[in-house]
Amino acid sequence: ALAGPAKVLAAEADRAAHLACQAAARGAGKPVHSLHRDLFRDPLTADEISRFDCVLLDPPRAGARNQANMIAQSSVARVVYISCNPQSWARDARRLADGGFRLAELRPVGQFRWSTHVELASLFVRD
């Protein structure tokens, strides 16, 4: 759904999720390149990221410290960051802000009715 007419790179460390992404993209006829890569251990470089207009990331609870550093060093203009851990999100958000991004939107999402768990959906932009 996100691809539209644009080219999309989907990087995923979990092999089953990676293969499911490939199959879904093929089935939908979308131009999605699925990359089996653990961005926690091997983040995309600033040069790799700079080829894109926008980055969407949804890291594990530990956050995306190394990837946030590379994003901050890139020339990408927008970052959509989904997080299940406000503490790691805050750390990574600080790195993005130090790299010239401004937090444009932040929305807490309480998607689990009988839980105190909150997901954060945020948009960072460079002006």
Question: What are these regions, as identified by a protein language model?
Answer:
Residues 1-127:
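Rossmann-like S-adenosyl-L-methionine
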